[in-house]
Amino acid sequence: MQIHDKPTLKAEARNLNFYYGEAKALKGINMPIYDKKVTALIGPSGCGKSTYLRSFNRMHDLYPGNRYEGEIRFFPDNTNLLSPEVDPIEVRMRVGMVFQKPNPFPKTIYENVAYGLRVRGENNKRALDDKVEHALRGAAIWDEVKDRLQDMAPNLSGGQQQRLCIARALATDPELLLFDEPTSALDPIATGAIEELVHELKKRVTILIVTHNMQQAARVSDYTAYMYLGELIEFGKTDEIFIKPQDKRTEDYITGRMG
Protein backbone atom coordinates (compact mmCIF):
# COMPACT_ATOMS: atom_id res chain seq x y z
CA MET A 1 0.00 0.00 0.00
CA GLN A 2 1.34 3.42 -0.99
CA ILE A 3 1.11 6.08 1.71
CA HIS A 4 0.94 9.73 0.62
CA ASP A 5 1.85 12.56 2.96
CA LYS A 6 -1.10 14.86 3.39
CA PRO A 7 -0.12 18.39 2.31
CA THR A 8 -0.03 21.10 4.96
CA LEU A 9 -2.44 24.02 4.69
CA LYS A 10 -0.89 27.46 4.29
CA ALA A 11 -4.14 29.34 3.66
CA GLU A 12 -7.81 28.62 3.08
CA ALA A 13 -10.65 30.66 1.60
CA ARG A 14 -13.90 30.06 3.48
CA ASN A 15 -17.20 31.15 1.97
CA LEU A 16 -15.42 34.09 0.33
CA ASN A 17 -17.55 36.65 -1.48
CA PHE A 18 -16.25 39.90 -2.92
CA TYR A 19 -18.10 42.94 -4.22
CA TYR A 20 -17.03 45.84 -6.43
CA GLY A 21 -19.74 48.18 -5.20
CA GLU A 22 -22.93 46.20 -5.79
CA ALA A 23 -21.37 43.85 -8.36
CA LYS A 24 -20.58 40.44 -6.88
CA ALA A 25 -17.26 39.29 -8.33
CA LEU A 26 -16.54 36.25 -6.13
CA LYS A 27 -19.26 33.82 -5.10
CA GLY A 28 -18.78 31.56 -2.12
CA ILE A 29 -15.18 30.47 -2.75
CA ASN A 30 -13.96 27.61 -0.56
CA MET A 31 -10.43 26.57 -1.44
CA PRO A 32 -7.23 25.36 0.24
CA ILE A 33 -3.76 26.69 -0.54
CA TYR A 34 -1.09 24.13 0.33
CA ASP A 35 2.24 25.01 1.91
CA LYS A 36 5.34 25.04 -0.34
CA LYS A 37 3.23 24.17 -3.37
CA VAL A 38 2.35 26.09 -6.53
CA THR A 39 -1.37 26.57 -7.13
CA ALA A 40 -2.47 27.87 -10.55
CA LEU A 41 -5.70 29.81 -11.09
CA ILE A 42 -7.09 29.33 -14.60
CA GLY A 43 -10.26 30.45 -16.36
CA PRO A 44 -11.53 32.93 -18.96
CA SER A 45 -10.85 36.66 -18.69
CA GLY A 46 -13.14 38.34 -16.18
CA CYS A 47 -13.90 35.17 -14.23
CA GLY A 48 -12.49 36.43 -10.92
CA LYS A 49 -8.96 34.99 -10.88
CA SER A 50 -7.13 38.26 -10.23
CA THR A 51 -9.88 39.46 -7.90
CA TYR A 52 -9.41 36.32 -5.83
CA LEU A 53 -5.61 36.57 -5.95
CA ARG A 54 -5.62 40.19 -4.75
CA SER A 55 -7.87 39.33 -1.83
CA PHE A 56 -4.95 37.52 -0.19
CA ASN A 57 -2.92 40.70 0.32
CA ARG A 58 -5.85 43.07 0.76
CA MET A 59 -5.14 45.04 -2.43
CA HIS A 60 -8.86 45.75 -2.72
CA ASP A 61 -8.71 47.81 0.48
CA LEU A 62 -7.05 50.57 -1.54
CA TYR A 63 -10.30 51.41 -3.36
CA PRO A 64 -13.56 52.63 -1.78
CA GLY A 65 -16.71 50.60 -2.31
CA ASN A 66 -14.97 47.22 -2.33
CA ARG A 67 -15.98 44.74 0.36
CA TYR A 68 -15.37 41.17 1.42
CA GLU A 69 -17.56 38.57 3.05
CA GLY A 70 -16.17 35.35 4.51
CA GLU A 71 -12.62 34.60 5.53
CA ILE A 72 -9.15 33.83 4.30
CA ARG A 73 -7.45 31.86 7.04
CA PHE A 74 -3.65 31.94 7.17
CA PHE A 75 -1.68 29.24 8.94
CA PRO A 76 -0.07 28.17 11.20
CA ASP A 77 -1.47 31.01 13.36
CA ASN A 78 -5.03 30.74 11.93
CA THR A 79 -5.24 34.50 11.28
CA ASN A 80 -8.17 35.78 9.22
CA LEU A 81 -6.35 37.99 6.70
CA LEU A 82 -9.58 39.85 5.95
CA SER A 83 -10.32 40.82 9.55
CA PRO A 84 -10.60 44.61 10.06
CA GLU A 85 -8.40 44.11 13.12
CA VAL A 86 -5.52 42.87 10.96
CA ASP A 87 -3.28 45.62 9.54
CA PRO A 88 -3.12 45.37 5.71
CA ILE A 89 0.53 46.46 5.83
CA GLU A 90 1.33 43.45 8.01
CA VAL A 91 -0.61 41.24 5.60
CA ARG A 92 1.50 42.51 2.69
CA MET A 93 4.70 41.73 4.58
CA ARG A 94 3.55 38.11 4.83
CA VAL A 95 1.97 37.95 1.37
CA GLY A 96 4.12 39.31 -1.48
CA MET A 97 2.90 40.11 -4.99
CA VAL A 98 4.34 40.23 -8.50
CA PHE A 99 2.22 41.91 -11.15
CA GLN A 100 1.55 41.21 -14.82
CA LYS A 101 3.79 43.99 -16.08
CA PRO A 102 7.16 44.57 -14.41
CA ASN A 103 6.79 47.64 -12.21
CA PRO A 104 10.16 48.60 -10.73
CA PHE A 105 10.23 51.80 -8.72
CA PRO A 106 12.08 54.74 -10.33
CA LYS A 107 14.96 54.06 -7.97
CA THR A 108 18.22 52.15 -8.05
CA ILE A 109 18.29 48.37 -8.23
CA TYR A 110 19.45 48.32 -4.61
CA GLU A 111 16.74 50.65 -3.34
CA ASN A 112 14.02 48.71 -5.13
CA VAL A 113 14.85 45.66 -3.04
CA ALA A 114 15.63 47.57 0.16
CA TYR A 115 12.36 49.52 0.08
CA GLY A 116 10.18 46.98 1.89
CA LEU A 117 12.91 46.35 4.44
CA ARG A 118 13.12 50.06 5.23
CA VAL A 119 9.33 50.26 5.57
CA ARG A 120 9.59 47.44 8.10
CA GLY A 121 12.15 49.46 10.06
CA GLU A 122 15.44 47.91 8.94
CA ASN A 123 18.06 50.66 8.63
CA ASN A 124 21.30 48.86 9.49
CA LYS A 125 23.51 49.11 6.40
CA ARG A 126 25.16 45.70 6.76
CA ALA A 127 21.83 43.98 7.41
CA LEU A 128 20.29 45.73 4.40
CA ASP A 129 23.22 44.73 2.19
CA ASP A 130 22.93 41.10 3.25
CA LYS A 131 19.16 40.94 2.78
CA VAL A 132 19.26 42.71 -0.58
CA GLU A 133 21.87 40.23 -1.83
CA HIS A 134 19.90 37.29 -0.44
CA ALA A 135 16.72 38.46 -2.20
CA LEU A 136 18.51 39.08 -5.51
CA ARG A 137 20.10 35.64 -5.32
CA GLY A 138 16.70 34.15 -4.53
CA ALA A 139 15.31 35.75 -7.68
CA ALA A 140 18.24 34.45 -9.78
CA ILE A 141 19.40 37.92 -10.81
CA TRP A 142 22.31 38.64 -8.44
CA ASP A 143 25.05 37.66 -10.89
CA GLU A 144 23.60 40.00 -13.52
CA VAL A 145 23.32 43.08 -11.29
CA LYS A 146 25.85 42.70 -8.45
CA ASP A 147 28.24 45.20 -10.06
CA ARG A 148 25.53 47.73 -10.94
CA LEU A 149 23.34 47.94 -7.85
CA GLN A 150 23.33 51.74 -8.09
CA ASP A 151 22.02 51.73 -11.67
CA MET A 152 18.41 52.74 -12.17
CA ALA A 153 16.07 49.75 -12.20
CA PRO A 154 13.95 50.88 -15.19
CA ASN A 155 17.07 50.50 -17.37
CA LEU A 156 17.02 46.71 -16.95
CA SER A 157 15.51 44.45 -19.61
CA GLY A 158 11.89 43.33 -19.19
CA GLY A 159 12.85 39.91 -17.90
CA GLN A 160 15.39 41.38 -15.50
CA GLN A 161 12.83 43.91 -14.26
CA GLN A 162 10.38 41.12 -13.49
CA ARG A 163 13.01 39.15 -11.58
CA LEU A 164 13.90 42.34 -9.71
CA CYS A 165 10.23 42.69 -8.75
CA ILE A 166 10.33 39.10 -7.50
CA ALA A 167 13.43 39.95 -5.45
CA ARG A 168 11.62 42.99 -4.05
CA ALA A 169 8.73 40.75 -3.02
CA LEU A 170 11.10 38.18 -1.48
CA ALA A 171 13.05 40.73 0.56
CA THR A 172 10.56 40.76 3.45
CA ASP A 173 10.53 36.93 3.62
CA PRO A 174 6.87 36.45 2.66
CA GLU A 175 5.15 33.16 3.42
CA LEU A 176 2.91 33.37 0.34
CA LEU A 177 3.86 34.84 -3.03
CA LEU A 178 1.17 35.95 -5.50
CA PHE A 179 1.89 36.06 -9.25
CA ASP A 180 -0.65 37.78 -11.51
CA GLU A 181 0.21 36.58 -15.04
CA PRO A 182 3.90 37.28 -14.42
CA THR A 183 5.15 36.29 -17.89
CA SER A 184 2.43 37.66 -20.18
CA ALA A 185 4.58 40.69 -21.10
CA LEU A 186 7.82 38.71 -21.52
CA ASP A 187 9.49 36.91 -24.42
CA PRO A 188 9.83 33.09 -24.39
CA ILE A 189 13.38 33.09 -22.99
CA ALA A 190 12.48 35.41 -20.11
CA THR A 191 9.30 33.38 -19.55
CA GLY A 192 11.34 30.19 -19.24
CA ALA A 193 13.61 31.86 -16.68
CA ILE A 194 10.63 32.92 -14.56
CA GLU A 195 9.08 29.44 -14.73
CA GLU A 196 12.37 27.86 -13.67
CA LEU A 197 12.55 30.36 -10.83
CA VAL A 198 9.04 29.41 -9.66
CA HIS A 199 10.18 25.80 -9.30
CA GLU A 200 13.09 26.93 -7.13
CA LEU A 201 11.03 29.36 -5.06
CA LYS A 202 8.46 26.79 -3.95
CA LYS A 203 11.16 25.16 -1.83
CA ARG A 204 10.91 28.17 0.49
CA VAL A 205 7.57 29.90 -0.17
CA THR A 206 4.00 29.01 -1.10
CA ILE A 207 2.94 30.31 -4.53
CA LEU A 208 -0.44 31.24 -6.01
CA ILE A 209 -0.29 32.12 -9.72
CA VAL A 210 -2.84 33.42 -12.23
CA THR A 211 -2.16 32.35 -15.81
CA HIS A 212 -4.06 32.26 -19.09
CA ASN A 213 -1.48 29.85 -20.49
CA MET A 214 -2.66 26.26 -20.05
CA GLN A 215 0.79 24.86 -20.84
CA GLN A 216 2.34 27.12 -18.22
CA ALA A 217 -0.18 26.02 -15.59
CA ALA A 218 0.61 22.39 -16.39
CA ARG A 219 4.38 23.02 -16.25
CA VAL A 220 4.69 25.01 -13.04
CA SER A 221 1.83 24.07 -10.70
CA ASP A 222 1.13 21.27 -8.26
CA TYR A 223 -2.56 22.19 -7.90
CA THR A 224 -4.96 23.93 -10.26
CA ALA A 225 -8.23 25.77 -9.68
CA TYR A 226 -10.64 26.48 -12.54
CA MET A 227 -12.81 29.56 -12.04
CA TYR A 228 -15.78 30.73 -14.07
CA LEU A 229 -18.05 33.75 -13.51
CA GLY A 230 -16.75 34.30 -9.99
CA GLU A 231 -17.22 30.70 -8.89
CA LEU A 232 -14.69 27.97 -8.16
CA ILE A 233 -15.74 25.19 -10.53
CA GLU A 234 -13.03 22.64 -9.79
CA PHE A 235 -9.88 22.30 -7.70
CA GLY A 236 -7.40 19.45 -7.54
CA LYS A 237 -3.94 18.18 -8.36
CA THR A 238 -2.79 19.64 -11.66
CA ASP A 239 -2.20 16.33 -13.41
CA GLU A 240 -5.69 15.15 -12.44
CA ILE A 241 -7.35 18.41 -13.52
CA PHE A 242 -5.66 18.32 -16.92
CA ILE A 243 -5.92 14.59 -17.59
CA LYS A 244 -9.28 13.75 -16.06
CA PRO A 245 -11.31 16.79 -14.96
CA GLN A 246 -14.49 15.99 -13.05
CA ASP A 247 -16.58 18.91 -14.36
CA LYS A 248 -17.46 19.26 -18.04
CA ARG A 249 -16.97 23.04 -17.86
CA THR A 250 -13.37 22.46 -16.80
CA GLU A 251 -12.84 19.99 -19.61
CA ASP A 252 -14.36 22.38 -22.16
CA TYR A 253 -12.04 25.18 -21.07
CA ILE A 254 -8.87 23.08 -20.97
CA THR A 255 -9.56 21.53 -24.38
CA GLY A 256 -10.35 24.91 -25.94
CA ARG A 257 -14.04 24.31 -26.55
CA MET A 258 -14.76 27.28 -24.30
CA GLY A 259 -12.56 30.36 -24.17
From Swiss-Prot:
What is its biological role?
Answer: Part of the ABC transporter complex PstSACB involved in phosphate import. Responsible for energy coupling to the transport system.
Annotated NCBIfam families: 3a0107s01c2
SUPFAM superfamilies under this entry? P-loop containing nucleoside triphosphate hydrolases
Q: Which CDD domains match?
A: ABC_PstB_phosphate_transporter
Q: Give the matching InterPro entries.
A: AAA+_ATPase, ABC_transporter-like_ATP-bd, ABC_transporter-like_CS, P-loop_NTPase, PstB-like
Membrane among the record's keywords? yes
Q: Name one Pfam family in it.
A: ABC_tran
Record protein name field = Phosphate import ATP-binding protein PstB
Q: Which reaction does it catalyse?
A: phosphate(out) + ATP + H2O = ADP + 2 phosphate(in) + H(+)
Q: What is the lineage of its organism?
A: Bacteria, Pseudomonadati, Pseudomonadota, Betaproteobacteria, Rhodocyclales
Native source species: Dechloromonas aromatica (strain RCB)
Q: Which family does it belong to?
A: Belongs to the ABC transporter superfamily. Phosphate importer (TC 3.A.1.7) family.
User: What EC number(s) does the entry state?
Assistant: 7.3.2.1
Identify the GO cellular component terms for this protein.
plasma membrane
Lineage, top-rank taxon, reads Bacteria
List residues of the ABC transporter domain. 11-254
Q: According to Swiss-Prot or TrEMBL, what is its membrane topology?
A: Peripheral membrane protein
Instruction: Give the keywords, sorted.
Output: ATP-binding, Cell inner membrane, Cell membrane, Membrane, Nucleotide-binding, Phosphate transport, Translocase, Transport
Record bears the keyword RNA-binding: no
